[in-house]
Amino acid sequence: MRTGWATPRRPAGLLMLLFWFFDLAEPSGRAANDPFTIVHGNTGKCIKPVYGWIVADDCDETEDKLWKWVSQHRLFHLHSQKCLGLDITKSVNELRMFSCDSSAMLWWKCEHHSLYGAARYRLALKDGHGTAISNASDVWKKGGSEESLCDQPYHEIYTRDGNSYGRPCEFPFLIDGTWHHDCILDEDHSGPWCATTLNYEYDRKWGICLKPENGCEDNWEKNEQFGSCYQFNTQTALSWKEAYVSCQNQGADLLSINSAAELTYLKEKEGIAKIFWIGLNQLYSARGWEWSDHKPLNFLNWDPDRPSAPTIGGSSCARMDAESGLWQSFSCEAQLPYVCRKPLNNTVELTDVWTYSDTRCDAGWLPNNGFCYLLVNESNSWDKAHAKCKAFSSDLISIHSLADVEVVVTKLHNEDIKEEVWIGLKNINIPTLFQWSDGTEVTLTYWDENEPNVPYNKTPNCVSYLGELGQWKVQSCEEKLKYVCKRKGEKLNDASSDKMCPPDEGWKRHGETCYKIYEDEVPFGTNCNLTITSRFEQEYLNDLMKKYDKSLRKYFWTGLRDVDSCGEYNWATVGGRRRAVTFSNWNFLEPASPGGCVAMSTGKSVGKWEVKDCRSFKALSICKKMSGPLGPEEASPKPDDPCPEGWQSFPASLSCYKVFHAERIVRKRNWEEAERFCQALGAHLSSFSHVDEIKEFLHFLTDQFSGQHWLWIGLNKRSPDLQGSWQWSDRTPVSTIIMPNEFQQDYDIRDCAAVKVFHRPWRRGWHFYDDREFIYLRPFACDTKLEWVCQIPKGRTPKTPDWYNPDRAGIHGPPLIIEGSEYWFVADLHLNYEEAVLYCASNHSFLATITSFVGLKAIKNKIANISGDGQKWWIRISEWPIDDHFTYSRYPWHRFPVTFGEECLYMSAKTWLIDLGKPTDCSTKLPFICEKYNVSSLEKYSPDSAAKVQCSEQWIPFQNKCFLKIKPVSLTFSQASDTCHSYGGTLPSVLSQIEQDFITSLLPDMEATLWIGLRWTAYEKINKWTDNRELTYSNFHPLLVSGRLRIPENFFEEESRYHCALILNLQKSPFTGTWNFTSCSERHFVSLCQKYSEVKSRQTLQNASETVKYLNNLYKIIPKTLTWHSAKRECLKSNMQLVSITDPYQQAFLSVQALLHNSSLWIGLFSQDDELNFGWSDGKRLHFSRWAETNGQLEDCVVLDTDGFWKTVDCNDNQPGAICYYSGNETEKEVKPVDSVKCPSPVLNTPWIPFQNCCYNFIITKNRHMATTQDEVHTKCQKLNPKSHILSIRDEKENNFVLEQLLYFNYMASWVMLGITYRNKSLMWFDKTPLSYTHWRAGRPTIKNEKFLAGLSTDGFWDIQTFKVIEEAVYFHQHSILACKIEMVDYKEEYNTTLPQFMPYEDGIYSVIQKKVTWYEALNMCSQSGGHLASVHNQNGQLFLEDIVKRDGFPLWVGLSSHDGSESSFEWSDGSTFDYIPWKGQTSPGNCVLLDPKGTWKHEKCNSVKDGAICYKPTKSKKLSRLTYSSRCPAAKENGSRWIQYKGHCYKSDQALHSFSEAKKLCSKHDHSATIVSIKDEDENKFVSRLMRENNNITMRVWLGLSQHSVDQSWSWLDGSEVTFVKWENKSKSGVGRCSMLIASNETWKKVECEHGFGRVVCKVPLGPDYTAIAIIVATLSILVLMGGLIWFLFQRHRLHLAGFSSVRYAQGVNEDEIMLPSFHD
């Protein structure tokens, strides 16, 4: 680590301290990764491998004895190219050499100079051979030193370019059979490179190594104007600390920006990331913002929307937006690009700001080293204060070094040290630039917490300091404050400047103290014992030591020593008095060991403290003499001072503590959040100065908890100022070795410390147990979420923020909070047992139960304090035993529940053991204890809310519920709810994670979306399920797609005004089981109902040793206590493996198993590198995970806990069981990918990443959003490479690859832009190739213009965003990454085959309906064009259809359906024979079939809407039989089909499908005498069958009017005719049921249930009378009558003519009919 305080850099004449110069002089490379020999401390022999086994040999530097620490805590042997490991599956000879990618345990750690590995086996030497023994005490050292093997930990080497986004190297890595333990150089890469994953042969992940280099070549860009070199790591994604370490490893630092000109340069820089880390941070406890390279922070450009003042949940790191130039505070753990910076010229002139100079000033002014200071006690605004100083021929004070800060803090404020005082720093600019009023250059800034906090766009801004610490704060210039004036004084003769010091030569004065260097190297204490009391004194001493060349590496003794070898360092006695340790300045990895003496280093680590051997080590000395008496020490609290209400302490402590554990807080927090939480209360995270203090603290904590808990404490090394050394957040100096050797692991990135509390009551009684195990501290990544403890000095009153709800005493005093329960002690009211129960119940609590030793001890101590040892208190009999999981107690009683029926129970502090073992008189009047469960996590069901039924056979029991899987039906929410009500249940409510897991385990054969019982309006808070249970658990999809969509409302449809929840079944997606919401009026599936049971299910495994099968895997639960390593061995005995969990269904099923066993169970997940990376022990890759949010990854092995989450546990802990498995679906070993493509060189800091035969460039640079249209984006890609184009995705593998890249930048973007355009009325890629593969979230888009954006989201689905709502489109655009792609192989011929409108194949012309339709709608659309839905009858036909679907890119309906109610009897809708099954194995439920682009044939509900269908039109017309129509048949209804005559009957068919009851009604509608067809003989059977085949539609199933009587079991026709002919299928296929159907395809009959299934209908009616013959007779008679009448008329006329004309005219009679003759048409 590089070294440097926040010391100033000065212009010519005012320059930096020497150690800063040394740091700049050369890159700070790490030597920790160099090879070494391993020396056995007892024998002095070195170890080496011989034929894979370890032997001892004489030490030398030959390669066969050289080892090296590599990634994941492995020891790599250079000569054999293997790693030292343990095969714990064998009982003997576990220790040997393994291939470094072996599944054996290869990690090693140090402890007190010993080396241990898996299962706590320790490396030992026995008879000259290496072995592993659990109780070994062998000491191991690095050759040529006294260092432990772990004293110099492995340091990561970070990368750039490549395809790893800055990830560190993974050493060793394997290429072509050779293991490489360092970066390598070859002609295929632009510089030394390394692999970044263990399995390079498969992953192909690599990057260019970032190592120290002199000058600014290769990876750097020079800028003469600013005298700097810049490294733009654009295509990387690291946390702030990782980025800082990466820069430091190269002798550089994270970017600091010191002027508007430099800011402009960065904004105008091409190829810079849009968002990237800068060195600005507030990581040093109790200090403000500062640059990591310690340059002054006087130029600012904060984003007003992300202010610099963090809140409780705020952030202490800063990033820059390159487009706006604005700085934003941001979570330090976010993964972002970064910029490093280092100076062009390392030569710096040095100046001395600490040399004493005697100065003369006017009366009242304070002289100091050439200047005079005046603190003016009147208050004025800044401008008036400035004017007053000018009137004194001076100026407001300017501060340029820590020497100036010391004057302010130690000399100007003797009384009121907390007063605020103006200094001469002021800003009048935008962006902010603070400048000194006296015109001197700003070389130091010293900001207070959360400062500088400059109001946005408001000037001027002025600065004050606080006298106590001298730290600065931005104020309104109108504030009235005191001020300090400063002017030059008269320097006196230098010869007399040290007149207060002894006359001997060499004494130097600093303040009121004199110092002298003795240049002879002597053992500790020979000359004097130096005490160092402050940072300022340390800086002065650094100045004294600066002349010693760092190459000589001199040391100077201090007076700090661990006299008792207990690890506690104190100042040696001086003048009979021992000063308290008030300041510490430890070096990297110090204090290293107990019993030593402390010396200060020179060189690059000037002034840093290191532990040395007091006798053998020799160093120079600095002696110190005070010119006056020792000053008084700061007053500290007294042990008997009180603690605030709700805070606790222990007798010897000077502090009060408050534990914030999971049951009492909203959430666990990372270290920074926890520290800010404490600060808001006026406290800090806990700190300690003495070993005994932390012991007592941990004993205190064990009374608060059972089990194991990690709690944040104030120890951290977050700030770059600390250079890798530890500090307490409340400024308590570090004087005690409380950090075990494991603190050295992954030292660069584990910057915060936590303490482990684990309850081991049996050990408290034994004096000889090892305290070091009890005091267990560990470093963690600071973003880990843990519980914490706040600490405040005794006697101080904490603050009470608005959001904080402090503990307050009730009417019975303050409660006792233990393990999530509140205990109230009712001492002033004595009641009998029953009265006590009722009293507690009336106050919303219960009579207390005792279920753990922690609770027992806390209650015992509490009642002893309240009422003495003998007073008895009522408690309640526990249903469960005390600590029933605890198996190590000395007493047997705890193993069994106390069961005395209705007997009563009390206890006292003195005789509690006897009291808990016997009943007593329930009428006795006693005080009592009430218990209230914490509702956040321990709420229990109210006993009166359970349903009054138990689970019947069809219902699946789980806990207090029954679940029923029903046939999926697509319904609205209310219909779905009614459906479950009809079964006597409700839609499921999900009340816990374990219930969620159980439901998820039922999902594999269910639909993609299922209703659950959650319903609410958009204007109300969701708080209850439809079964009236409280909403205590939720599992909404984290992306919550519907949250971005508007759910339409229909004013006339009440359901649409409500939102209802769905559970998502996304197959193997990690989001399977999560919830979404939609309009309640939409149709989704109901497949699962629930009801409550009176009796909670006591599901247990009848025989725990038997295997259980789920999906394709066999599982075995081992129900016995064992460690992780033992569990692995047990599984191997059964030829099984510790389980690897790779999908959400498997996870859910095993979570339920863990609950049923009520045990945490080992799984095969473990880490070899202190939780940085986890992998499965069977070698499978970790794709799916279920980490507990509250656990953090704190240990190396993993259990599946009873709550369904993964939690890390010490591998050597005993757990109550393990899960073994045997996979029945073992896939082939992962095939090594071959990337033969060579990509172009990086462009503008952005590398091209190879995948398959393409190269990709993911653009996260600034101004990437300036390209808004597809053409502009394409132009941007063309500038990168003429062959590139905007991203297209051809298949699922490529989709997954692009998703993987996007997830690296999930802090910056939510989508990758897709190059999809709208041309020629269809969507296509920008290169005009069709979308042969798609993954749209909502199916086929309905886009009809170019006004849209498309992107791949962080869950892998494609989203489309139109420009209808411009704000959403802008958000989509600004949160997208642009991606360019070069296809190194011409894919156009392969992918440019646009799907034709018509496609001939065999005897048909095929086409695709490209719109969303149901199966029935698709059938109708095909029929309207004279065609059918597609059918397939051989493999070639299947391949043809699959090719159509693949080219279309969407799932399409085909003509296959089943309508017999069983979803198993499928038919082609075109009437062709179902003679070829295109799918294999089981498929999803559903009665219609579609084909998806992956070639999968899926069963779906026919009324579900899909993305289209395949139609075909026959090219050959079908030869049809001649049909006979007769007028003796009933007339056809309007627009209806005609009746067909066959023999003596008329027949009419219908194209629709009907149930049996519908069929009967339909026939009577056609004609009142018509019935469902009856068949009397074989000819009629053939006629009806032929009629159906020639008029095929959907199915060949035809209802017959034949039914069976329930009484005599006889069969009869509906038309009443006798059954004279039947044609049943053979008995094995004829079916069961009381109704019948004709199967027209094979002309046989089948018995079916009348209520199930659908079929075609043929109606039958007898032939009517022959009306034509009758009409002919009538007509003939009419003609004869007419002819007779005519003859009579002619006769009469002739008679009159003969007789002469008559006077009487013919008149028609009123009763004569007119007869009309109808015309006849044959």
UniProtKB/Swiss-Prot annotation:
UniProt subcellular location: Membrane
Extra remark beyond the main annotation: Isoform 2 and isoform 3 are produced in HRS cells by a transcriptional control mechanism which cotranscribe an mRNA containing LY75 and CD302 prior to generating the intergenically spliced mRNA to produce LY75/CD302 fusion proteins.
UniProt topology in membrane: Single-pass type I membrane protein
Extracellular side: 28-1666
Pfam families, alphabetized: CysR_MRC2_N, fn2, Lectin_C
Gene Ontology biological process terms in this record: endocytosis; immune response; inflammatory response
Protein name: Lymphocyte antigen 75
Domain of life: Eukaryota
GO cellular component: external side of plasma membrane; extracellular exosome; plasma membrane
Principal cellular location given in the protein's record: membrane
Residues recorded as bearing Phosphotyrosine in the entry: Y933
Lineage per the UniProt record: Eukaryota, Metazoa, Chordata, Craniata, Vertebrata
Keywords: Disulfide bond, Endocytosis, Glycoprotein, Lectin, Membrane, Phosphoprotein, Receptor, Repeat, Signal, Transmembrane, Transmembrane helix
Modified how: N-glycosylated.
Regions crossing the membrane: 1667-1691
Cytoplasmic-side segments: 1692-1722
An example molecular function term from Gene Ontology annotations: signaling receptor activity
